[in-house]
Each structure stands twice: as C-alpha cells, then as structure tokens.
Amino acid sequence: MKEKHNPRRKYCLISGLAIIFSLWIIIGNGAKVQAETITVSTPIKQIFPDDAFAETIKDNLKKKSVTDAVTQNELNSIDQIIANNSDIKSVQGIQYLPNVTKLFLNGNKLTDIKPLTNLKNLGWLFLDENKIKDLSSLKDLKKLKSLSLEHNGISDINGLVHLPQLESLYLGNNKITDITVLSRLTKLDTLSLEDNQISDIVPLAGLTKLQNLYLSKNHISDLRALAGLKNLDVLELFSQECLNKPINHQSNLVVPNTVKNTDGSLVTPEIISDDGDYEKPNVKWHLPEFTNEVSFIFYQPVTIGKAKARFHGRVTQPLKEVYTVSYDVDGTVIKTKVEAGTRITAPKPPTKQGYVFKGWYTEKNGGHEWNFNTDYMSGNDFTLYAVFKAETTEKTVNLTRYVKYIRGNAGIYKLPREDNSLKQGTLASHRCKALTVDREARNGGKLWYRLKNIGWTKAENLSLDRYDKMEYDKGVTAYARVRNASGNSVWTKPYNTAGAKHVNKLSVYQGKNMRILREAKTPITTWYQFSIGGKVIGWVDTRALNTFYKQSMEKPTRLTRYVSANKAGESYYKVPVADNPVKRGTLAKYKNQKLIVDCQATIEGQLWYRIRTSSTFIGWTKAANLRAQK
C-alpha cells in the first residue's frame, strides 16, 4: 500500500480500511483471547470510569445513557472505536473489548495506555496528539500492523522492539533522537519520522521494503544509509537543521563540511553566512569580531528508487565567546583562554621567597580579590595579579630585575620612601640593563626594591622580563597613511618586545596606502602591523598614522544596482580600498546582472558599495561604477 504523507489523506484511508475490516474479529488458528470479562450485566459508567470514554461506548452500543447496563456479549460486538478529539483522559475498561481491531483516539488527553495490553486483535492504533511517553504496553499486540503516535512528545521508542510485524509507523512531531530500534522493523513500507531530532539514520539502511519515507525537519546531514532503499516511491528530506558542537571563536575559522549525499560525496554549500567561503572540504570564515554562530545552507536533489526528493537544510556552528585571562606574577605573565560566563579554574598558587601568597587580585595593588568559586569570566580580556604579603618589612634578597620601559621617569631614592628630598634621579639611564636587587621593603603597602649601588625604587617600576609583554595581538582590517613620521620608526615586532628589530624610518612610507593586518598593545602604546603592495613591512606606533578605513565605517543598506556600460573594466575588491593585493577581479563578468548592495562605506569622500548576486558574495566597488537601472 502506497501512502502520501498527508494527515487528511491518512485518516480518510484509515476510515475506509476500517469499514473493510469491520468483521475482523476472528482470532487466528482458533487461539483463545486472554481478555478480562464481566459476568453480570453492568452499567457502562462502572466499566468505563472516564466520562468521555463511557459516552463513546454508549454511542457505539446505541444505548441511551451511560447508566444503561451491558453484557459481555454486547462488549464483544465492538470491533472498532473512533473517538478523536473527545477529551478522553483514560481508556480504563477497554480490556473488556477483546474484539477491537481498530482504535482511533487522536487528539485526546491520554497518558497511560496499559489497558491496551490484552487487545490481541488490535491491528490499527492511532493515538496522535495525546501525551503518551511509555510504549512498553504495546509489546504484546502481535497483530498490530499500523501505529500512529504523532505529536506526543515521545523521546524513547525502544518499546517498539517487540512489534516487528508493523507495516506502517507514524512518529512525526516528537522528540526522538535515537532510532536504533527501527532496524528490527523490517516489514515497514511506510515510516514517518518528520519533525524530530534525528541525526543518525544508519538504522534505516536495512528497511528495504520501505515505499514511503518522511524525514523532513530533523538534523540529518549524511544520506549514505538510504542508498539501498530501492523500493521508495515517496521520500521527503527538506528543512534539516544540523547543529555542530560549539567551538571557540577564531578570527580565521575553519569548519569541515560533513553534509553527504547517498554516494558519500560532499554537498556543496549554497549560501554561507558572514561572507564565508567554501574551499572543499572546508567552510571558512574571517571573523575579526565575535559572533555567536555561523552557518551555511545546502541543497541537493536526490533520487532513490522512484522517489525524488529535495535534500536541503542549514548547518549551524555555534561559537563560544572566549577571552584571555593573564596571570601576572611580578611581571611574569601566563595566559589562558576562558569562555565568557563560566568559572575560571584556579591556577597553582605561586611562591616567592620571603613572601606569603595572599591571592589573585584584579589590580596590582589591591582591587577585587578573585573568588574562583563564585566569580565568573567577564566579556573581555583581563589580568589577575598575584599579591604577596611580605614576611618582614625589610630583608636581604638577590633578584634580577629590569626597568619597565614606560617607568623610565620613575624616581630613585636614598630610602624606600617617595620624598623629593631623598630623590637621587630617575631610572631612565638604567633601561635595558640587568639590575641586581639586594634589599626589599614594604612602606605604606607598597613593595620597594633597592638596586645595588643605585638606590631604592618601587617594585612596580621593575619587571622580571627585559622586554614588554603584549596585552593582546589580534587580526584587524583597516587602511592608513603616515600622519607624523618625525621620530617614528618601523619594527619587526612592537618596539621593546622580544625579538623586535629596526626595519626603517617611517618617513620612507609617507603618502603610501598601508594595509593594516594586525593590532597589538604593549605597555608603551598600541601598534599596527602593515603591508604595502602585498608585502608585509613591520610594526608602527598607531599614533603616527591616520586611519582612513576601518570596518566600523561600513553601514548596512539594501539597494539594487547594475554595472554601468562603460565601467565593466573597473575592479572590485575585498575591502573598500583600491589596493591591488585585495583586488578580486573586474566587473565585466557581472555585466547586465542584477546586483544586490548590502553594505556601503564612504572612504575619503568616495562612496563604495559591497555587492553580491542573490547567492554569491562579490566584493566592494566604487558606487560610481554602478547604476540604478539596467
């Protein structure tokens, strides 16, 4: 029997078959029905305590009232019950109806179907739109051929393992994830599982008698298990919602494509969110700013047997917002990534000779002491500082420290006290030198170091490291030109960080477009790494530049444009700057095509449009290259 999965058609078909099989009350091979019986004439409402169900039985037996008495012979005459949308909450008493072959109780309020256990002749059972969760009571219904349990909120279908004789099964609009048990139901010709939470369909591979299969609105991304179902006449696979496991946000994100056709080949994404690209087998995104998810839409026509289907849906990749916690122990910094809104794992308490570790604090000198049991990661990078308590006010030590570059003007004193009358000079001349600390003291809660043969200075002016640490280093997209070359240079790394070497004077690059690649912050300032003509040059102080393009200048819009006839040779770019390294091509290939403008930016007085077709991202071009009419 072939069926189209249409609820109205399904129930019309069932009603017709109910009439055809209305005389199906004989038990095969003369077997005796093990059902409960009444021995004396009994009022209907005493047998069937649910008022609504009692009314159904009254009407079925053509009685005037539920107080009318009935005999077991009269109950034996009932072979089908149709009581859809009747507000029935219990079918208690149905065990006295041994010859029921068809039972239609859709749209009621049933939760317990244990009374059905002994209905050995039951062949058709439809219980859509109830509140049934436990299917174990169906295990002895060996004549059951057609079962419908749609819209019940079912998550566990393991109770169906005892029903291998089923030929049609409707389980749509539930909460099913695991269909392993269905591999046992090899006689099925119709199976509906639409609108569930199914991702693994391997258990269906052996159901070769299937003619009608409904799998729309699930989480399916791999069709290989369906390749052998050659008897299919109807197959539905649309609107799949596939959710990957969350991963950390990255500025350059790579996600493998796992959507597969029946032959195992990858299904190419049709539309990729957030300007992503597809480079088989990976989907790639450039995400300089955090977004909580990315996705792509897929579409693939599929033919299996006689069935033609549209396999399409969306794959969503959730992203975790992670930030950096820096643990600073007297200038030595260890960094770790932590998801926003979660608790931070406490690191091993640091040790320091002559000091007792007090705790981790949000500021070097005080602030909030971090409670690793109750405090949660905020939505930004931050530093926790190890705070120690001196065991004595002054003692002998033997340490090596360096002057922090930005502390060069800090004072040196005869005693561990900030008093101009005791001042001997500044730390400027001692930069970049390894300095020996031979004494330490605390005064007013401040830690002081005595530099051997030099004098006293605050410990906060010194560092364990010769070089500055970068507070962050991230990819950015921007363009700039030199604003102030005087006294500024270009470095292989941000100045005064480990490995930084002089490249050139900044004046050499005056007037040139500088493509900004990365941004880093050190205690001195914020730095940009830049390239010119596609060649990476180095790092420069951002204060020396004038940034004429950054992504925040882009504004969303919605326009339709066409390439101007005389502008087909003009170029389009990855960003709204006419720079050859980001050039993508010319507008000639899009001549006479309808283009969508989804973003605009005004760069140095010049209006730019970001264009795309209905499904493909193109790039940025000057608005002057386009016109409103075809």
UniProtKB/Swiss-Prot annotation:
Residues 241-330 form the LRRCT domain. Ca(2+) 1 binds at residues 49, 51. Keywords: Calcium, Cell membrane, Heparin-binding, Leucine-rich repeat, Lipid-binding, Membrane, Metal-binding, Repeat, Secreted, Signal, Virulence. It is found in: Secreted; Cell surface; Cell membrane. Residues 31-76 form the LRRNT domain. Residues 320-392 are annotated as: B repeat region. SUPFAM superfamilies: E set domains, L domain-like, Prokaryotic SH3-related domain. Residues 241-319 are annotated as: Ig-like region. Disruption phenotype: Deletion of both inlA and inlB prevents uptake of Listeria by human enterocyte-like cell line Caco-2. Single inlB deletion no longer invades various cell lines. Decreased synthesis of phosphatidylinositol 3,4,5-trisphosphate (PIP3) in green monkey cells, decreased infection of host cells, decreased association of host PI3-kinase catalytic subunit with tyrosine-phosphorylated proteins. Deletion no longer Tyr-phosphorylates mammalian MET. Ca(2+) 2 binds at residues 55, 59. GO terms for molecular function: heparin binding; lipid binding; metal ion binding. Belongs to the internalin family. Monomer. Interacts via its LRR repeats with the extracellular portion of mammalian host MET; MET can bind HGF, its endogenous ligand, and InlB simultaneously. Probably forms a dimer upon interaction with host MET, which subsequently allows dimerization of the host MET and subsequent host signaling; dimerization probably occurs via the convex surface of InlB. Interacts with host complement component 1 Q subcomponent-binding protein (C1QBP). Interacts in vitro with human intestinal mucin-2 (MUC2) but not with mucin-1. This is Internalin B. It comes from Listeria monocytogenes serotype 1/2a (strain EGD / Mackaness). The gene is inlB.
